[in-house]
């Protein structure tokens, strides 16, 4: 076998070696050889290797009838792999093309693939495609099209099409250099020698899928894989070895995560093969990947130590055991001795003390010290269900999300049920709608460490800082939602946004300001109108707390049609919003309402 030296390759003149291994193949081999001779690309050599056929010389007579049109070799029987290796050692071409003695090439097989190579920068690329399945008599059964199974971009990811059973060895056009660099067929494998070698080569070689059908593959009862009794066991061993040898990096490249690769491989093996042992191994490895995935749970604490301890206890009973808890004491003034004592008892709990700067700064400190693949947040007055981390982690790995949240349950100060909030229905591409309605609650969130390292909480905001970050993340990513209550959010008078109209309205104003001051988010400023309407409504609640709320609310919304009209005037919306924010902060709600009404009469 010759190899390329350091010389430029004129691809149109490169020699392609077509190797035809045959054992007792007189019945079909003439069709195979004729299809090779009929190739429109003429710079080929056809090598026929007789693997010790025992058919009274019929195979040899057919081969010799072609004279010098082919290169014919006879050897002792050693199996298909040994026959291919014999041909490889004697080939002179720069490229290798396998043709089984019972298969057929379309006339343009080699020319078409060489044309593709000529258009590619990397001439060391392996070309492959689908095939036509035919019966013993050559009748067409169906077409096997890999692009009907995987998208084109995935068909060009080395290894993935192989591990989804989409590679037919006779469809390949492969540089011969890989036989030198990686090796040749394992002759000890009677029926899996092809996938064994392709696996080794595809780990180092680029591949290119071509949608053209260029070969006919014959399906018949005399094929080796159907006659060799231990074929299934050999396949189980082979596929199990694949799973053990693959690196995490390779799995991630193929499917986005090792867990997703393993579960999809298990599904493929279960649905398409009888290789139960390999399938069970893939499932076992997938479960282990989840078990080995560390989740960092960040709990900022400011006083209310008894609730903080309850929050910690809800984490300690999680069914997913691989976690760390980062307690960020944001300058508590209460006695924290009981809290620190609990932290010292469990090595999974890390305690940090800092001066009081608000929840955003506390969470950011946790993010900077987290080591898990994922981060989950839990406010010190809230609780996790015991299977929260397990369910959400599996959901994110299965769907390849980098951010997710769930539905939750509201409870009162004593932990009693108030209502269920199905916020988990909010999912997918939710931007820019998330600006005007953000139902994502802090203790329901889980995201990758990398995501939060690149997107910290805005520390200059103490109310609404969480929604600001969720909006920013949603503007660049799809949001995963689980409509299952996995957290409990405590509603407590005076300290909780849900129960404090002033805190709630300030949060809405902060979110609006955050959006308007961001160069990208500000393009969607009309979506902040509802935030300001809600803020104004909440502030009127404070102003009219001793009046008939229903009456005053109806009176206020008499002007609602005017506000709706603003949506069609994007050029004035930002001005109005900025004026509103400034007015509310400096002059109060009564003056602001009067100012808005006067401004609208003048400009709209």
What are these regions (language model features)?
Residues 108-142, 387-418:
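Conserved donor NDP-sugar-binding/catalytic core segment of glycosyltransferases
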Residues 57-60, 75-91, 112, 354-370, ...:
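Glycine-rich, basic loop-to-helix element that forms the pyrophosphate-binding segment
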Residues 33-74, 312-353:
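Acidic donor-binding segment of Leloir-type glycosyltransferases
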Residues 89, 129, 143, 147-242, ...:
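Conserved nucleotide-sugar donor-binding catalytic segment
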Residues 100-104, 130, 379-383, 407:
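The conserved acidic donor/metal-binding loop of glycosyltransferases
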Residues 96, 375:
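Short aromatic/hydrophobic "clamp" motif used to bind/position activated sugar donors
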Residues 2-11, 161, 166, 196, ...:
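C-terminal subregions of glycosyltransferases and related glycan-biosynthesis enzymes
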Residues 1-37, 287-316:
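N-proximal low-complexity "stem/linker" segments adjacent to membrane-targeting elements
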